[in-house]
């Protein structure tokens, strides 16, 4: 014979007030937790971008140490012809940033190339005929990095490579590797003079200052 557990005749379930209170607590916790998680995720992206711009910058300097110049050869074999280099596997067909920028002007005018065509493979402009020399004391000895990727916000890292070969005394004095950062807008001057810092929430690594 099973014993019967007495039921509290006064306890028929949760009251409406209790349910509303519980839902309010859950909503409050969600309101606190979601922004915290979002902030932590954004901080992780920023940290990743800092690591990657530094890695790209060090690869640029390693290239310089073996070739004797920064990568600026175009598909015809002419040096000091590129103004911008950008990461990722393909050439963008439209402005990947949220605002107009000199970097995109250079890219769309044909004065740019993929970083990988210089640092990962010896194929300026994506071709294999006109290349950096591979023998002698000043030669291409890569790859200098693994295939580059987009930044944590799915936009290219960019390098104002013109600063690596220009002789201007007023412009192009700082060579940067840049991410546009969380807001997607490059606010660092592409024509960087000596006093021009990283702008906005851009994330940058200074490769060279001359």
Language-model segment annotations:
Residues 10-41, 45, 52, 57:
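N-terminal single-pass transmembrane signal-anchor helix
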Residues 47-50, 139:
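Soluble non-cytosolic domains of exported or imported proteins
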Residues 1-9:
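N-terminal secretory signal peptides that target proteins for export/translocation
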Residues 2, 46, 143, 150-210:
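Short, surface-exposed interaction loops/tails
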Residues 75, 149-150:
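Short capping/connector residues at structural and topological boundaries
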Residues 60-144:
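Short, glycine/small-hydrophobic-rich surface segments
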């Amino acid at each position: 014979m099973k014993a019967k557990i007495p039921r509290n005749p006064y306890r028929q379930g949760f009251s409406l007030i209790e349910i509303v209170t519980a839902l309010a607590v859950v909503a409050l916790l969600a309101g606190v937790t979601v922004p915290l998680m979002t902030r932590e995720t954004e901080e992780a992206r920023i940290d990743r971008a800092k690591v990657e711009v530094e890695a790209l910058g060090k690869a640029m300097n390693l290239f310089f140490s073996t070739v004797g110049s920064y990568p600026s050869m175009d598909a015809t074999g002419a040096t000091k012809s590129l103004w911008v280099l950008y990461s990722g596997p393909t050439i963008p067909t439209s402005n990947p940033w949220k605002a107009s920028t000199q970097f995109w002007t250079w890219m769309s005018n044909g004065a740019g190339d993929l970083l990988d065509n210089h640092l990962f493979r010896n194929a300026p402009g994506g071709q294999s005929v006109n290349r950096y020399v591979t023998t002698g004391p000043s030669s291409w000895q890569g790859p200098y990095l693994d295939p580059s990727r987009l930044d944590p916000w799915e936009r290219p890292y960019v390098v104002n490579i013109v600063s690596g070969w220009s002789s201007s005394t007023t412009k192009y004095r700082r060579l940067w590797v840049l991410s546009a950062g969380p807001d997607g807008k490059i606010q660092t001057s592409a024509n960087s003079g000596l006093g021009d810092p990283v702008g906005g929430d851009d994330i940058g690594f200074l490769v060279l200052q001359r």
